[in-house]
Curated annotation (Swiss-Prot):
UniProt KW keywords: Endoplasmic reticulum, Glycoprotein, Membrane, Signal, Transmembrane, Transmembrane helix
Bias-annotated ranges (Basic and acidic residues): 41-57
Coiled-coil stretches noted in the UniProt entry, renumbered to this chain: none
Record InterPro entries: PMP22/EMP/MP20/Claudin, T178A/B
Tissue: Highly expressed in the bone and its expression increases during osteoclastogenesis.
Name under which the protein is recorded: Transmembrane protein 178A
Organism name: Mus musculus (Mouse)
Bias kind Low complexity: ranges: 68-79
Lineage start: Eukaryota, Metazoa, Chordata, Craniata, Vertebrata
Length: 297
């Protein structure tokens, strides 16, 4: 096999591996994971003996259940008078006062991808029971369309506006991530086809075009992965922090799906570099050979 054909075959193999890894990353849901077990253990140690005896054997104490008997929303008054609009007032109005403490939020182990966010089963019996009884869904779809949130009474308008704007910016980041990954797959597939054609027709030209397509795929992947990292950071830093941020002892980070995407990026950049660099290397060798022959003559 000629050296040029060998380089084309190697770059085609790398591009096919990259395509497989990229498709695997897109259609799996393990891009980002959270594990609050260490956080719950520390909360249980700090809360030991604080719960009444009739709640110690419950899966979830009454104070942490999402549904509690409370007066209708219209009958509840803001603490401190009707004109008060500080965060403490609307938090207590919505029953969110217990979220101020780090142990007041019901946190569960989750994993998420581009399309869904799911709960891990077998880690927390609270969420396992809720899912088995049909009270909670194991997986929920990640939104790629903007839906107007419900306007709750007695919540400061500035806070509502901030939440809506953050949701809109996060939606744009998600769309950029998914859109550029889709374009990366399409361009990579075209590059594989062109690299295959190079075995039969205009090897030099088609190899160069395939290399350009591979490098373009790498650019799209880089934009998409950086945008995804930005969306995760943006989501964790949204306000109000008591709802969107995570306690410091909750383990969270990227998982194997996004590492598949990064490996795909590495393979495709290597394939594009081979296709682009080989013609220049071969020309340099030919020039050296010609100069050597001329010197001997």
């Amino acid at each position: 096999m000629e050296p040029r054909a060998l380089v084309t075959a190697l770059s085609l193999g790398l591009s096919l591996c990259s395509l497989g890894l990229l498709v695997t990353a897109i259609f799996t849901d393990h891009w980002y994971e959270t594990d609050p077990r260490r956080h719950k253990e520390s909360c249980e140690r700090s809360r030991a003996g604080a719960d009444p005896p009739d709640q110690k054997n419950r899966l979830m104490p009454l104070s942490h259940l999402p549904l509690r008997d409370s007066p209708p929303l219209g009958r509840r008054l803001l603490p401190g008078g009707p004109g008060r609009s500080d965060p403490e007032s609307w938090r207590s109005l919505l029953g969110l006062g217990g979220l101020d403490a780090e142990c007041g939020r019901p946190l569960f182990a989750t994993y998420s991808g581009l399309w869904r966010k799911c709960y891990f089963l077998g880690i927390d019996r609270d969420i396992d029971t809720l899912i088995l009884k049909g009270i909670a869904q194991r997986c929920t779809a990640i939104k790629y369309h903007f839906s107007q949130p419900i306007r709750l009474r007695n919540i400061p308008f500035n806070l509502t506006k901030t939440i809506q704007q953050d949701e809109w910016h996060l939606l744009h980041l998600r769309r950029i991530t998914a859109g550029f990954l889709g374009m990366a797959v399409a361009v990579l597939l075209c590059g594989c086809i062109v690299a295959t054609v190079s075995f039969f027709w205009e090897e030099s030209l088609t190899q160069h075009v395939a290399g350009l397509l591979f490098l373009m795929t790498g650019i799209f992947c880089t934009i998409s992965l950086c945008t995804y990292a930005a969306s995760v950071s943006y989501d964790l830093n949204r306000v109000p922090k008591l709802i969107y941020s995570l306690p410091h002892d909750v383990e969270h980070g990227y998982s194997w799906s996004i590492f598949c995407a990064w490996c795909s990026l590495g393979f495709i950049v290597a394939a594009g570099g081979l296709c682009i660099a080989y013609p220049f290397i071969s020309r340099t060798k030919i020039a050296h050979l010609k100069s050597g022959r001329d010197s001997t003559v």
